[in-house]
């Protein structure tokens, strides 16, 4: 009887350990939120942010967890200096007053143990709004050099920038919808 109880206790402990979440740190050298936005209804402008940080708590068994990504808005990059300077200024991001965009959410709706949605809130320009992203892919491997779990994901969604007080160009016919893509990699913390 004692052996049976010991075996059951070990089995329960093992299943609890395998279901535990792992803490990951966003790899800023491999994480670049990018976006597409309308230009006067005649073309699409694309850009990205070069500086992001954050953390993920991920339970690979359940396919659930939490995510927090902080993006430095001054790192916006359109590939055109004049547009970058304007976007950082008071007429758009106003990075001196609102230096960061922050997304906080939870990984949900797993299929075969992999989440398919990231449901949360985006705070930008002093405004917080709900935002749901589709998780297009998520894969974890053993990092060959660091010998730790390393995960990469691609998520996408869209939002109305006017909802965040970023309405520049609206009077000229610019559409307010922004398509967002986040390519992110994160390393398990020791």
Please report, for each region that a protein language model flagged, where it lies by residue.
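Low-complexity, acidic/polar, glycine-enriched regions of mature
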Residues: 19-190
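Positively charged n-region of N-terminal signal peptides that target proteins for export
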Residues: 1-5
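Hydrophobic helical h-region of N-terminal Sec-dependent signal peptides
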Residues: 6-12
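N-terminal signal peptide c-region/cleavage motif recognized by signal peptidases
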Residues: 13-18
């Amino acid at each position: 009887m004692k052996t049976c109880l010991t075996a059951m206790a070990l089995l329960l402990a093992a299943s609890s350990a395998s279901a535990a979440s792992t803490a990951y740190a966003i790899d800023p050298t491999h994480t670049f939120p990018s976006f597409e936005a309308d230009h006067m209804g005649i073309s699409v402008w694309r850009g990205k942010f070069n500086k992001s940080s954050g953390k993920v708590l991920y339970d690979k068994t359940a396919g659930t967890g939490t995510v927090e990504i902080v993006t430095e808005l001054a790192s916006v990059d359109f590939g055109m200096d004049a547009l970058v300077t304007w976007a950082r200024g008071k007429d758009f991001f106003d990075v001196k007053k609102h230096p960061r965009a922050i997304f906080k959410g939870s990984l949900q709706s797993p299929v075969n143990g992999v989440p398919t949605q990231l449901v949360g809130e985006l705070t930008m320009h002093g405004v917080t709004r709900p935002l749901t992203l589709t998780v297009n892919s998520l894969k974890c491997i053993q990092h060959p050099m660091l010998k730790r779990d390393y995960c990469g994901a691609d998520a996408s969604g869209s939002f109305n920038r006017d909802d965040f007080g970023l309405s520049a160009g609206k009077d000229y016919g610019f559409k307010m919808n922004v398509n967002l893509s986040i390519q992110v990699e994160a390393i398990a913390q020791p």
